[in-house]
Amino acid sequence: MTAIEPGYIPLSRSGELERRAEALEARLASCDICPRNCKVNRLHNETGFCHSGFLPIVSSVCAHRGEEPAISGQRGSGTVFFGNCNMRCVYCQNYQISQSWREQKSNEIDCKALAANMLYLQDDLKCHNINFVSPSHFVPQMVRAIAEAAPMGLHIPIVYNTGGYDSLDTLKQLDGIIDIYLPDIRYADNKTARKYSQAPDYVVHNRAAIKEMYRQVGDLVVDKNGLAQRGLIVRHLILPNGLAGSEESLEWISGELSPAVTMSVMSQYSPQHRAHKIPLLSRKISVAEYEGVVGVLFRLSMENGWLQELSSSDTYLPDFEREGHPFDTDPKEVQETLSCREFEGVPHSIKKSPKNGGLRGLNITEDKSSPQTGERAQ
C-alpha cells in the first residue's frame, strides 16, 4: 500500500495550493469566510463579528499533549491557537484569547512568521501534526501559511480543530489541504446555540460542515503507532441540563453519516468565563447525565473513538496568561488525573487507551503501510 502523504504536498507541487490561497484571500475584501458573512474589507483591516483584520492573530504555539491519543501521540500535537473567534460561547475555556479582542491585537503576525512557527513545531519540537485551533475566521491566512511552509519542508498532517461554525463554501476550498478534521458538534437546537454562543443558525451550518468534512476525508485512519493520518473525528462536549442535545446530535451522526464515525465524547465541562452566573450552566455535569450519553452511544452502536472519564473536568484547563505553555502541566500528571474507569454496559470493544489515560479508546482503522509521516515522527 502506498504511504499516506499529506494532501497539501501534491497541491503545493502543482501550484493549486497557491491558487487556493489567492482565491481565499480575495474573499477577505468582502468577508464571507465564515457563516457570519460580515462583508467587511479585511484586506483593509476592517473588522466584523470576529474583530479580526488581515493579519492572523496567533495567541499560542505549543506542543499539546492533552488532545485525543491519535492526535497528541507521545510528543504532542503542534498546536497553533488563533486568537478571537466567530462564536461567543459563554462557557469558553479559551475565553482569555477568544473574547479579548483589544489584547489579542498585539498577537498579530504575518503568514511567513506563522509558517516559520509551523516548521518549528515540526522540526524542533518534533510534533506529530500541525493543529490549528479555532481557524474558521482565519482560513485564508492558514492556507497562505501552509503554502509558505510546504516548499520549506513541512510534511506532517494538518488538523483543522474547529468549533464547527464553518462556511460550506470555505470548506470546499480546503478539500485536499486538510488531512484531519476535528470539529465540534456543540448543539442540536438553534435557540440554545443563539442563547449561549450567539450563533442562531449553528445547527444547519454545523451539520452541513461536518457532512462536507466527512465527504473529503472519510473515516479516521491511523498509522502503526496509532497516530492519525487522515479522517474525521467529531467532538461532542456534554453540557449540563441537556443543553448540548447529546442524544439528538449522536443520532444525527449515526443516521446521516455512519455509526462508524470516530467520536470524542468529552465530559470535561466546568463553568468557565461567564457560565458560573448562568443557572443552567453553573455546574459540572452529573453522573446521570454522563451515563445517559454513554447509554446513547451503546444504543447506536457507535464504537469508534474515545470517551472521556467524568473526572476530567477537574484539571488541565488552559491559562493563556501564564508565561510559556498555556497547559504547563506535567504529562504524567495529565495521564493520572484524566484516568478513566471501565463502564459497565458500554460496547465490549471499548478499552482503556494506552496513549492517554483520560480517554477510553474504541476501534480505529489502522493503515498498515507505515506512512512516511508516522515513520518520521518516531
Put a short name on every predicted segment.
Residues 50-181, 190-191:
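Conserved Radical SAM active-site core
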Residues 98-99, 139, 164-167, 185-203, ...:
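Conserved radical SAM core fold
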Residues 96-107, 195-200, 277-284:
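Short glycine-enriched, charge-decorated loop/helix-capping segments at active-site entrances
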Residues 1-46, 218-378:
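Auxiliary Fe-S-binding modules of radical SAM enzymes
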Residues 175-190, 260-269:
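Non-cysteine beta-strand/loop elements that form the S-adenosyl-L-methionine
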Residues 146-155, 209-213, 289-293:
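Alpha-helix-loop-beta-strand connector modules within alpha/beta enzyme cores
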Residues 78, 130, 158-160, 181-183, ...:
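Hydrophobic faces of well-ordered beta-strands that scaffold small-molecule active sites
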Residues 194-198, 203-224:
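Anionic-ligand binding region
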